[in-house]
């Protein structure tokens, strides 16, 4: 009788372990498209990502680079003070989007151009995303806003 209980306990433990491994694998598989890593322009130039990789880029919209094309296509460059990456975006830009202002874009880096699928602008005059602030500090061009 004891060996039957012991055998049942071992079966339950094995089944629970298999279920846990399977659940972890399914969660990881489901999240693979939902995780976007942040990169500064200097990081992209130093180590260009694969064209199939979706990630976020952040920095300042470089002065004098904002060009509105046909329809809703917009071209500009993003800089962190150390490097500059050209960006192309088709869609409606946020109201607060402007040259020399902070932005974060989501998209892919293809043939030396970041093809953005989404553009976010900073919220107000003093807000800057932490990732962008860190990248600008790393390049030595960050200026704290006047309070």
From Swiss-Prot:
One of its GO terms (molecular function) is heme binding. HAMAP family: CcmE (MF_01959). Heme chaperone required for the biogenesis of c-type cytochromes. Transiently binds heme delivered by CcmC and transfers the heme to apo-cytochromes in a process facilitated by CcmF and CcmH. Heme binds at residues 123, 127. It holds the Pfam family CcmE. It is a single-pass type II membrane protein. Keywords: Cell inner membrane, Cell membrane, Cytochrome c-type biogenesis, Heme, Iron, Membrane, Metal-binding, Signal-anchor, Transmembrane, Transmembrane helix. The chain crosses the membrane at residues 10-30. One of its GO terms (biological process) is cytochrome complex assembly. Belongs to the CcmE/CycJ family. The gene is ccmE1. Residues 1-9 are cytoplasmic. It is found in: Cell inner membrane. Its main location: membrane. This is Cytochrome c-type biogenesis protein CcmE 1. The keyword Transmembrane helix applies. Residues 31-147 are periplasmic. GO terms for cellular component: plasma membrane.
């Amino acid at each position: 009788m004891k060996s039957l209980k012991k055998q049942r306990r071992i079966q339950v433990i094995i089944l629970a372990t298999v279920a846990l491994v399977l659940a972890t694998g399914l969660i990881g598989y489901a999240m693979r498209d939902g995780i976007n890593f942040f990169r500064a322009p200097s990081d992209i130039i130093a180590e260009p990502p694969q064209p199939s990789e979706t990630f976020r880029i952040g920095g300042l919209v470089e002065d004098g680079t904002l060009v509105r094309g046909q329809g809703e296509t917009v071209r500009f460059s993003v800089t962190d003070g150390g490097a500059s990456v050209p960006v192309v975006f088709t869609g409606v830009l946020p109201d607060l989007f402007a040259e020399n202002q902070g932005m974060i874009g989501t998209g892919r880096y293809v043939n030396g151009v970041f093809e953005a699928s989404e553009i976010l602008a900073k919220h107000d005059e003093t807000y800057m995303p932490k990732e962008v602030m860190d990248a600008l500090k790393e390049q030595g061009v960050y200026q704290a806003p006047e309070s």
